[in-house]
């Protein structure tokens, strides 16, 4: 269930506004909920929160080879717009990474408290929570299985288990990226389908 916020600020999308701690959005959104497949009209109370700390997941698929749920997160936006004293326009265009996560029950991916810096390959404290672009955090948050350039908007994820493609594609993931709108001053990216190999 996607979060209805960029960074859980006291004043949403307001320059310099601090993050709410703990973030109340995580009680009902920003995560994956599990419901019974044989019952209609279920409420939150009837579901189980499977994982948390995910800003907005659109692409997800069950990997039958590893018997695990994988998700593609749409990362946060506007680092420079909201924190111009910390992030340059170029940094804002390149951060944070879009991430592929392998989930287990109870997994925490860290949003809104952290974001993943795909250039440094580190979990960083979000500026809403005292981050300065250098401070690492998220000790209890899981690492992404893979990361991709910022703002590419991964909207589809499919593990290939068929027999039509060459064997090198077997059990790998196809990821459909919607494409970016906010990578200025850099060129926009995305608008493609990528293949992510999986060894095991």
Predicted regions and their residues:
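A conserved catalytic-loop motif detector
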Residues: 2
């Amino acid at each position: 269930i996607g979060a209805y916020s960029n960074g859980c600020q006291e004043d949403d999308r307001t320059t310099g506004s601090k993050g709410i701690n703990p973030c109340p959005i995580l009680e009902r959104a920003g995560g994956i909920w599990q419901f019974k497949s044989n019952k209609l009209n279920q409420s939150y109370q009837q579901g189980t929160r499977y994982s948390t700390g995910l800003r907005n997941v659109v692409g997800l698929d069950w990997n039958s080879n590893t018997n695990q749920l994988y998700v593609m997160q749409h990362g946060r936006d506007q680092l420079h717009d909201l924190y111009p004293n910390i992030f340059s326009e170029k940094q804002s265009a390149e951060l944070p990474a879009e991430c592929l996560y392998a989930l287990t029950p109870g997994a925490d991916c860290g949003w809104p408290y952290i974001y993943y810096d795909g250039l440094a390959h580190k979990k960083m404290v979000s500026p809403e929570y005292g981050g300065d672009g250098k401070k690492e955090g998220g000790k209890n948050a899981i690492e992404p299985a893979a990361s991709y350039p910022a703002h590419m908007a991964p909207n589809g994820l499919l593990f290939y288990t068929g027999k039509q493609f060459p064997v090198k594609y077997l059990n790998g993931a196809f990821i459909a990226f919607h494409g970016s709108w906010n990578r200025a001053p850099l060129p926009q990216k995305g608008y493609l389908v990528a293949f992510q190999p999986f060894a095991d």
